[in-house]
């Protein structure tokens, strides 16, 4: 997939930048990392596989510095992400967490029904609904696929903005996704082409950094909706995205973030 190519490119770029800073970097495929029982004091990763994440957690528990933390990666699963962002006061749509076996009784339409137990893996894991019947159909599909929990977000009108950031650095990049560019879940189609509603980029960076702290993912990306009055609300947050449009600049800043944290760890 194109996104895998982009992810490999940013990972390679960070490796290159860390070597330029004088670090010795060894790169492993996830499978080899787990099977060979690789150890390390400082590890950076773009892990997705459950076995890798479990292995990283055990290394973290033993004192290793892992960026992004395997615990942080798990925090980006829809349900814990929603709970942690709301708890930390990060601006977020009205949300409900329900068992897929239960009836949805809130009167919140239109809305997005999202798989709650993992990252979205297929487009059916996030669906738009305008009435109770549509929500019930989506929940039935989740049940059929053994998905136990759903997160329901109110649909927000406004401009969809995507962003990338690196906590602890001045790096922050945002853009309007075009309706045709690797549309994530069709929100672009429903919200239409961005109108360019003015908003505070500084405020978006502050809230994004706050979300990164709440979730424990210093290298992050996400989506937010800017309402007509300029209010911003974060609707999605990801650990270590592809940084597809700003790879050159981001690579150096991610390396700087890892390097700074590594030096602190070694004191």
Feature map (PLM): residue ranges:
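Short, small-residue-biased leader/transition segments that mark boundaries at the very start
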Residues: 1-6
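C-terminal active-site "lid" helix and adjoining low-complexity regulatory extension at the edge
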Residues: 13-17, 199, 213-217, 226-267
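A short, well-structured beta->alpha microelement
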Residues: 15-36, 97-102
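A short glycine-rich, hydrophobically flanked beta-strand micro-motif that places a catalytic Asp/Glu
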Residues: 28-30, 150, 161, 217-229
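N-terminal glycine-rich "phosphate-gripper" loop used for MgATP/nucleotide binding
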Residues: 28-60, 70-75
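A short beta-strand motif that forms the metal-chelation/ATP-contact edge
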Residues: 40-44, 111-114, 163-165, 230-245
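Active-site nucleotide/adenylate-binding loops and adjacent lid/helix of ATP-dependent enzymes
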Residues: 60-63, 71-160, 202
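Phosphate-binding site of ATP-dependent enzymes
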Residues: 128-215
């Amino acid at each position: 997939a194109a996104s895998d190519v982009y992810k490999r490119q940013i990972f390679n770029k960070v490796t290159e930048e860390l070597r330029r800073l004088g670090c010795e970097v060894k790169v492993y495929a996830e499978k080899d990392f787990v099977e060979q029982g690789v150890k390390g004091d400082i590890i950076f990763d773009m892990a997705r596989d459950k076995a890798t994440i479990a292995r990283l957690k055990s290394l973290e528990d033993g004192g290793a510095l892992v960026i992004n933390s395997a615990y942080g990666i798990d925090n980006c699963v829809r349900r814990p992400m929603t709970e942690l962002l709301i708890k930390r006061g990060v601006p977020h749509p009205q949300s409900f967490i329900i068992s897929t076996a239960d009836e949805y009784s809130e009167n919140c339409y239109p809305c997005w029904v999202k798989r709650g137990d993992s990252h979205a893996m297929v487009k059916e894991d996030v669906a738009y609904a305008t009435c109770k019947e549509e929500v019930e159909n989506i929940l039935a599909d989740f049940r059929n696929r053994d998905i136990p929990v759903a997160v329901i977000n109110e649909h927000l009108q406004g401009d969809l903005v995507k962003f990338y950031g690196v906590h602890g650095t001045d790096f922050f990049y945002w853009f309007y996704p075009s309706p045709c560019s690797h549309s994530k879940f069709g929100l672009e189609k429903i919200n239409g082409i961005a109108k360019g509603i003015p908003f505070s980029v500084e405020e978006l960076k502050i809230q994004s950094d706050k979300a990164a702290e709440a979730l424990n993912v210093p290298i992050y990306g996400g989506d937010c909706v800017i309402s007509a009055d300029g209010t911003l609300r974060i609707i999605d947050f990801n650990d270590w995205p592809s940084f597809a449009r700003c790879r050159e600049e981001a690579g150096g800043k991610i390396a700087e973030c890892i390097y700074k944290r590594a030096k602190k760890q070694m004191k």
